[in-house]
Amino acid sequence: MVVRYPMAVGLNKGHKVTKNVSKPKHSRRRGRLTKHAKFARDLIREVCGFAPYERRAMELLKVSKDKRALKFIKKRVGTHIRAKRKREELSNTLAAMRKAAAKKE
């Protein structure tokens, strides 16, 4: 927001006013995860587990073959960005599993 000065000429001419801050458009929330969608995905993950390609990628991540895992996932899911997101998700899952195993012992 630009501070308006009481000048008769220039870009900031005119009466000082406070700008109305409008709410962001509803169309801007496309792609944001809702509570219900997160719950549904977590439930499905709990019931179904991981797909075979995800299990193989997790095995590659376990032996520190991150780049190979990325190439493998990219071949399966299609795009580089989706593959990076999937690799991150699987590595977070592995870390959580390691943490749970350490807590158990």
Curated annotation (Swiss-Prot):
PROSITE patterns: RIBOSOMAL_L36E (PS01190). Keywords: Cytoplasm, Ribonucleoprotein, Ribosomal protein. Signal peptide: none annotated. InterPro entries: Ribosomal_eL36, Ribosomal_eL36_sf. GO terms for biological process: brain development; cytoplasmic translation; regulation of cell cycle. The keyword Ribonucleoprotein applies. One of its GO terms (molecular function) is structural constituent of ribosome. GO terms for cellular component: cytosolic large ribosomal subunit. The keyword Cytoplasm applies. Pfam families: Ribosomal_L36e (PF01158). It is found in: Cytoplasm, Cytosol; Cytoplasm. Component of the large ribosomal subunit. The ribosome is a large ribonucleoprotein complex responsible for the synthesis of proteins in the cell. Belongs to the eukaryotic ribosomal protein eL36 family. Component of the large ribosomal subunit. This is Large ribosomal subunit protein eL36.
